[in-house]
Amino acid sequence: MEQKRTGLSYVFTLAKEERGKLSLGMLLAVFSSALSFVPYLVVYQILLLIIKQEVTLPAMLGWAGIGIAAAVLQAILTSFAGICSHTAAFNTMHRIKVRVLEHMSKFNLGFFQEHAPGQIKTTLFDDVDRIETFLAHSTLELAQAIVVPLMMFIFMLRLNWIMALIMLVPMILGIAIPMALMGRYPDLTDEFAGDTEKLNASANEFITAMPVIKMYHLTAEKFEQYRNSLKIYTDCWIKMCESSCNPLSIALVVLDSAILFTLPVGGWLYLRDSLSAASYLLFILLTMCFFTSFLNMVTIAMQSMELGSGLDNVKKIMDMETMKSGQQTLSKTGCYGIDFDNVTFNYTQGGKDALSDVDIHLEPGSLNAFVGPSGAGKTTAVQLLGRYWDVSSGTIKIGGVPVTELQTENLSDLTAFVFQDVFLLEDTLLENIRMGTDATEEQVRQAAKAAQIDDFIMSLPKGYATRIGDEGVKLSGGQQQRISIARAILKDAPIVIFDEATSYSDIENEHKIQLALQNLLKGKTTIMIAHRLHTIRNADNIVVFQDGKVVEQGTHDELIASGSTYSHMWDTYTRETIGEE
């Protein structure tokens, strides 16, 4: 079944706090447009004076003064209307972006792995900016397009009802024909929004991956992918233009030729003495003014169709279910065990299980290792511990409390992750380690020393005040990893998870990090994920994953003695290590 498009009413729902300013702006715009009608009345009155041969200087100056005053007042009202609508639009844009970000901050972290940054960026900026543009400009034009033609039509009815009804003919044709010919335009706006997201994602990937692309001579292949995305985007844009060009052209022709309806009918009425010469000329002037205002309604209809896909994207995010926070809390100074009780998880409903019937018990303060081939489920297991996603069935507990029953802030305080891919802010090294905490510079330095990165930082001219990023220092993969470890040490959470924590470290630094971790992680429940099996020989418990299941667990010596999966992994690893040496 076709999904129902989000209506314009949702725009005003999003802008409900600004309805007062928007209403005032629209009201001022209506008065301003009504004043644009005054010059035509002035011309009409002057024509009457000329026809009646009652022209006097005071009368002419009086009507001229009225016309000038109306023009000045119209300019003032238009200015204030724009101030009201733009203020409301910018406030609404700010409020929507804050609300969307706040809402997204309550999602499971898996949402950000499932959605490309380009897709999120399109919704947060492009779609919301279109809403701002609509509120700032189209709301005023909409009020003018409805009220001004209506006022003119009522005036023309009082002047001559036959001429007024004749004016409806081009108006009806100008609406009906374009709407009938619009065809796939509404669907194309949805398609265009999707193509825009894909183009942003493709461009982001192409630029971000440029070093790897050049290293492996993939420039032509990856550029071809980007060019294909650009071609799809361009083709859709051309289809939209083709779909709207003919209807809009017909609307313009019909509405601009409205005078062809009023001229002959007005002439016929004049010859029959049913219409005065002054009224006849006034109708000719009003015809041009009437349909210029009315044409805005056709333009706004097109804009609303384009706005619809953006509204759909915003509403889709705002309607997404957030991660439910529990009510219980655990002290950050405690020491807790971790239990996976019959945990099963799949990324898509009905899809293959990424984890199946996983049972693990990790003792408080123990050093644990999750090992296994890529895709075995070890990273998924620790992500479920941090509630990147919630389990499909079973329970994960910290200190006997299910993670779903813990307050989300408390769960974050209890766990510290060292990710394989390190994200660094374009800020100083001090702030990158501090990460929003109130730690002193000395505490940051102690954490950096423990992570074996203090010597490098102090060797820089600005030390901890050195900035990272385009305008600052560039860090190697191993240095970035140690910054991440320093963050985890500074956080001092009772549970620490290292995902491929030493994958970027050379032998010397890896040894230093291992020594530091042995001293600093005492009393903490630690999970390490590593392919370098020699780094976890001293682990209290090694959990072996294969195809989403736990196939064995125990100490290094116990697993070697069993001669099973881990033993074969160890033999393969040692042979490869000796071969490399």
Residue map of PLM features:
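Short intracellular "coupling" helices and adjacent cytoplasmic loop segments at the cytosolic face
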Residues: 1-3, 90, 98-122, 126-128, ...
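Membrane-integrated ABC transporters
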Residues: 1-36, 51-63, 81-85, 89, ...
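Cytoplasmic coupling helices
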Residues: 2, 83-102, 140-147, 167-211, ...
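An intracellular "coupling" helix at the cytosolic face of ABC transporter transmembrane type-1 domains
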Residues: 12, 16-20, 109-110, 126-135, ...
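Transmembrane helix-loop-helix hairpins at lipid-water interfaces of multipass membrane proteins
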Residues: 22-77, 159-162, 274-277
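Hydrophobic alpha-helical transmembrane segments of ABC transporter permease domains
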Residues: 27, 31, 35-39, 125-170, ...
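Helix-loop-helix
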Residues: 49-65, 155-169, 243-312, 317-318
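ABC-type nucleotide-binding domain
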Residues: 333-581
